[in-house]
């Protein structure tokens, strides 16, 4: 699109939205009607920076796009510009609430600029600002995500194996065998990485019955806030905090949703083991069932408790102790 025609004074604080794609990105200014675009590379970054140098920037919001946003966000941060990388679902829901029902790169960029204006006026603005991920943590995140991809592929191939075309089984079995080797190799790499960079935390977490290497890796990789935030906040980030659904005199059923699915899934698998072998979680689970809670609700509550225990251990540096952590709410 053409250059924005939005005119501002020299002292006007402006809010920028950036919509990222693999090859290009589009940016817009809150209150403008048009956007600009550039290639997603250093030359394109310089085009954006040239525009920003003419402005007094209050906040730049970039939609998280599978890591495509990291390079630009890091460049902006190094130059001292305030940057927030936001959840795509939150950004889209905000856009719809503002009446942006259609979806194009330009519309998204302007909607993100509007979102930047809103976020900048929140009391806890510091909580949304981007901070670069350390290289060793970024590497662990990449390995954990890759393992999930391989596991999903293996599940898909296993399901295909049960199909009616027996002539395909040899091919499917060969793919499964290759995937098994890839997963085993990646498990060793993840274990070595945890040993090198997260040894103490890894040991503390894996001392908890139910928490294995894969759960530990997912939690360490995608919950770096553990130990620095309250348990309730951790539960909200993962999507394990029951959220109210009330309106007027209606008191709806509370439910959990959203959050970091890769951590939530890992904790759920750990919970299935913990309700059998971890004395603290087992007693808690049985008490919930005795109180009439459905199994799914009880399991979710156990995952919530397990996360709070991990958060408390990360904060205190204490080893797993059933007598202490059994009272963690």
Could you describe each region identified by the protein language model?
Residues 213, 217-291, 295, 322-329:
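Phosphate-backbone recognition surface of nucleic-acid-processing proteins
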Residues 30-59:
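Nucleic-acid-processing active sites and adjacent nucleic-acid-binding tracks
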Residues 1-13, 35, 47, 56, ...:
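Intrinsically disordered, low-complexity and often Lys/Arg-enriched segments
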Residues 6-30, 112, 150, 217:
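Gly/Thr-rich phosphate-binding beta-strand-loop-beta motif of the actin/hexokinase/Hsp70
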Residues 57-68:
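Short glycine-rich phosphate-binding loop at a beta-alpha junction
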Residues 2, 74-77, 84-209, 217:
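Long, charge-rich intrinsically disordered scaffolds of nucleic-acid metabolism proteins
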Residues 290-323:
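Charged substrate- and nucleic-acid-binding regions of tRNA-handling and nucleotidyl-transfer enzymes
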